[in-house]
């Protein structure tokens, strides 16, 4: 019953979205901006209510998918892995919506409506991606987030500012595109092109099993050559989506130009689809070829950690620094998920969930507070903020500690389990992976000290800073994110007990 309820609500909202878009000139006549946002927030809260109900029904002692239902000729269901990715999505959706709550101050109704609909549509697509049980639907939903994200970044991303904090509007006849439009094209072209290889591999899967259901993949035996073809196609699409070196260049640009809600959704949820795709499409039936290609995957992961870590130290854009931090964390997650042991796979998922809380918190601080107030992403633009914005400074320091993996945080648990899992697989790779801990500490402390301490910035009027500290709305969002990081860091078994059986079915015996 609950599956039908979820799918029915999602389809109804999707249809209403299409109707509103087509008839927005009529509907918007009597609707104020604040009501548009409040209605969308109520819909998300309703999804959260359904998510709580699903958690109540979920049985941690049952192996495989639960609450399975066939709706519109597609099988839907959840296991322990998809359950917690859905939970993460439901937590971050209202945060992403509220993060840009003040969008209506200088925007018309159509742009506000476009914004809230894009957030809802992206959330719906991601949730459907986590609960679908067939290959075709998975691929369609896997790529379907591109279009709304493209519009969100290209139309609502950051605008260039001059020295007087005036928006620079480019002329109609100017052939140059704005940085936010460039970022939108980057993510669209990069991920769409790489997904063609993924589509080829999924097509081979479907041809071999003559079916589109996940469960049938377990029942086929593939030759090494065929496994290699499928693996290469899938891993290309996944590594670009994650991303890792050398196909990482789109992520810093996209984060830098995205609205804060776009950065929260991208860092918190969308790049986790790559980890989920590895579990659903690679680990279940490509174990023989994983053993062959694992050294290559681990080498890419180590190169990503070292290269990205070093170039992060040279960055002066505060949002780009956080974006590069995401790449390093996801490189650890990729390595540990291929470790073929419970500790490694659990650690990979816990890192993904922890990163889904910590990275949005950092983006909210530097992109949703500093950038919204002073319209600059340059690290040298800000100094001595601890004197004038004490509450902001405390939260930035705490978020930085979480990002570094301080004990009693979920980040610490995820990194500890991941590195243990990598060590079980190969001690040399584990030792090299620990470089991520040191480099993360260095660039995070650099970011914190540059922003909070030192001499007063010559670029900011002191009197303009007073009273610009964190407001109640921002405090609420940050406290929610910090609460879950600490809660799951102190009691990680809340998540792990749901993952154990699902992960145990992914392990294989090396030949």
From Swiss-Prot:
Membrane topology of the entry: Multi-pass membrane protein
A GO cellular component annotation in the UniProt record: mitochondrial membrane
UniProt-recorded Gene Ontology molecular function terms: NADH dehydrogenase (ubiquinone) activity; ubiquinone binding
UniProt key word ATP-binding: no
Enzymatic reactions: a ubiquinone + NADH + 5 H(+)(in) = a ubiquinol + NAD(+) + 4 H(+)(out)
Subcellular location: Mitochondrion membrane
Keywords linked to the UniProt accession: Electron transport, Membrane, Mitochondrion, NAD, Respiratory chain, Translocase, Transmembrane, Transmembrane helix, Transport, Ubiquinone
Pfam families: Proton_antipo_M
InterPro entries found in the cross-reference section: NADH_Q_OxRdtase_chainM/4, NADH_UbQ_OxRdtase, ND/Mrp_TM
EC number(s) from the headed UniProt entry: 7.1.1.2
Membrane-crossing segments per the record: 1-21, 39-59, 78-98, 116-136, 137-157, 186-206, 220-240, 264-284, 289-309, 318-338, 349-369, 388-408, 422-442, 476-496
Domain of life: Eukaryota
Job description of the protein: Core subunit of the mitochondrial membrane respiratory chain NADH dehydrogenase (Complex I) that is believed to belong to the minimal assembly required for catalysis. Complex I functions in the transfer of electrons from NADH to the respiratory chain. The immediate electron acceptor for the enzyme is believed to be ubiquinone.
Family: Belongs to the complex I subunit 4 family.
Name assigned to this protein: NADH-ubiquinone oxidoreductase chain 4
């Amino acid at each position: 019953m609950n599956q039908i309820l979820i799918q029915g609500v999602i389809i109804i909202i999707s249809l209403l979205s299409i109707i509103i878009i087509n008839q927005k000139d009529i509907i918007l006549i009597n609707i104020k901006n604040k009501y548009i946002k409040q209605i969308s927030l109520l819909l998300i809260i309703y999804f959260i209510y359904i998510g709580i109900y699903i958690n109540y029904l979920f049985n941690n002692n049952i192996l495989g998918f639960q609450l399975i239902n066939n709706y519109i000729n597609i099988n839907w269901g959840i296991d322990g892995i998809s359950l917690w990715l859905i939970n993460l999505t439901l937590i971050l959706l209202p945060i992403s919506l509220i993060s840009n709550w003040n969008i209506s101050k200088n925007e018309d109704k159509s742009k506000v409506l476009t914004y809230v609909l894009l957030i809802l549509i992206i959330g719906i697509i991601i949730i459907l991606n986590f609960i679908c049980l067939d290959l075709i639907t998975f691929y369609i939903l896997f790529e379907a987030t591109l279009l709304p994200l493209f519009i969100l970044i290209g139309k609502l991303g950051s605008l260039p500012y001059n020295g007087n904090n005036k928006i620079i509007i480019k002329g109609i006849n100017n052939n140059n595109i704005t940085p936010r439009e460039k970022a939108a094209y980057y993510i669209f072209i990069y991920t769409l092109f790489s997904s063609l290889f993924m589509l080829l591999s999924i097509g081979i899967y479907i041809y071999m099993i003559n079916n589109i259901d996940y469960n049938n993949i377990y029942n086929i035996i593939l030759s090494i050559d065929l496994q290699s073809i499928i693996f290469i196609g899938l891993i290309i699409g996944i590594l670009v989506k994650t991303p890792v070196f050398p196909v990482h260049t789109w992520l810093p640009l996209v984060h830098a130009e995205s609205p804060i809600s776009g950065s929260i959704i991208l860092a918190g949820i969308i790049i986790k689809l790559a980890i989920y795709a590895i579990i659903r499409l690679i680990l279940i039936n490509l174990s023989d070829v994983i053993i062959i290609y694992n050294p290559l995957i681990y080498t890419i992961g180590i190169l990503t950690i070292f290269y990205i870590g070093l170039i992060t130290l040279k960055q002066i854009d505060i949002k780009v620094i956080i974006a590069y931090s995401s790449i390093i964390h996801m490189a650890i997650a990729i390595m540990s998920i291929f470790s073929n042991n419970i500790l490694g796979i659990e650690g990979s998922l816990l890192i993904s969930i922890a990163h889904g809380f910590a990275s949005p918190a950092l983006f909210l601080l530097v992109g949703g507070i500093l950038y919204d107030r002073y319209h600059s992403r340059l690290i040298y633009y800000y100094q001595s903020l601890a004197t004038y914005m004490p509450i902001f400074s405390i939260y930035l320091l705490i978020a930085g500690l979480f990002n570094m993996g301080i004990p009693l945080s979920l980040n610490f648990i995820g990194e500890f389990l991941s590195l243990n899992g990598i060590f079980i697989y190969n001690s040399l790779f584990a030792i090299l992976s620990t470089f991520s801990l040191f480099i993360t500490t260095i660039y995070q402390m650099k970011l914190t000290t540059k922003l909070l301490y030192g001499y007063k910035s010559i670029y900011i009027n002191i009197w303009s800073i007073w009273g610009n500290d964190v407001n109640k709305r921002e405090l609420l969002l940050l406290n929610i994110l910090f609460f879950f990081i600490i809660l799951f860091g102190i009691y990680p078994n809340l998540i792990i007990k749901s993952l154990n059986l699902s992960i145990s079915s992914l392990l294989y015996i090396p030949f």
